């Protein structure tokens, strides 16, 4: 499935992975992951970011996300992750564009 990976001080990029927890954990760099549901996507991140003193990556709805995080599609029927559509990729690539985030946004809303 195609996902977006957003790393600290980097532009978002598309990555193709298997639809399994191990693939997500490997990217996040942590065995424990947190999943937040937002409309048509899921935000996957490291819940220990504050405890591990990871740098703030982006702000989402006022929440400081620390460390690398992932955006996946949301398969509501199956209650599972799914790949992002081309439209979703475009939308979230623009939303988390580093230059946009740095220049004039402190908080992105999903």
How should each PLM-predicted stretch be described?
Residues 37-41, 45-74:
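Acidic, low-complexity, intrinsically disordered interaction modules
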Residues 17-24, 58-61:
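A short, sequence-level motif marking secondary-structure junctions
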Residues 10-14, 50-54, 77-82:
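Short, surface-exposed beta-strand/loop "edge" segments at domain boundaries and coil↔beta transitions
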Residues 1-19:
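N-terminal low-complexity, intrinsically disordered segments
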Residues 96, 100-103:
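Short, flexible helical or helix-coil boundary motifs
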Residues 67-95:
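Short, compact, well-ordered microdomains
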């Amino acid at each position: 499935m195609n996902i977006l990976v957003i790393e600290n001080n980097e532009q978002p990029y598309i990555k193709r992975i298997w639809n399994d927890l191990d693939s997500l954990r490997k990217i996040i760099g942590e065995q424990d992951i947190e999943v937040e549901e937002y409309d048509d996507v899921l935000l996957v991140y490291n819940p220990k970011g504050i405890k591990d003193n990871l740098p703030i990556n982006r702000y989402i709805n006022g929440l400081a996300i620390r460390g690398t995080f992932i955006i996946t599609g949301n398969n509501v029927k199956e209650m599972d992750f799914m790949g992002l559509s081309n439209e979703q990729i475009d939308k979230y690539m623009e939303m988390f564009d580093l230059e946009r985030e740095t220049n004039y946004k402190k908080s992105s809303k999903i």
